[in-house]
């Protein structure tokens, strides 16, 4: 998310607890942060595809081939996780547009600026997320 941070930091603006929660300026700030993060992931994905296409060499040594296949599998797993992250970013951008961004989907209360800074795709407050995870653990243990 390095580029996302760089693009958002072009402005000195930082959301503050002293202003109305999710005002137009905050919404625009988080929208830009999400868009920059998405663009960074897409750029990395394009680089991966390019790298994988170039690396079609045949390894004579079995160990080299195994190592290359392991690297390739790891790269593809990483890209799959990032594909899922793009979906979460797109969902967050839709919430920005419909005005529900920044509010807990469970309680309707503000998620909090610090949490959104750390995890811009968050859909629940810390407390609601902890309750959700406890319920999941209980159901998993059944």
Swiss-Prot record:
Its main location: cytoplasm. It holds the Pfam family zf-dskA_traR. Keywords: Cytoplasm, Metal-binding, Zinc, Zinc-finger. GO terms for cellular component: cytoplasm. PROSITE patterns: ZF_DKSA_1 (PS01102), ZF_DKSA_2 (PS51128). InterPro entries: DksA_N, DksA_RNA_pol-bd, DnaK_N, Znf_DskA_TraR, Znf_DskA_TraR_CS. Residues 128-142 have a biased composition (Basic and acidic residues). Residues 1-20, 51-70, 119-142 are annotated as: Disordered. A zinc finger (dksA C4-type) spans 104-128. It is found in: Cytoplasm. GO terms for biological process: regulation of gene expression. Belongs to the DksA family. Interacts directly with the RNA polymerase. Transcription factor that acts by binding directly to the RNA polymerase (RNAP). Required for negative regulation of rRNA expression and positive regulation of several amino acid biosynthesis promoters. This is RNA polymerase-binding transcription factor DksA. It comes from Caulobacter vibrioides (strain NA1000 / CB15N) (Caulobacter crescentus).
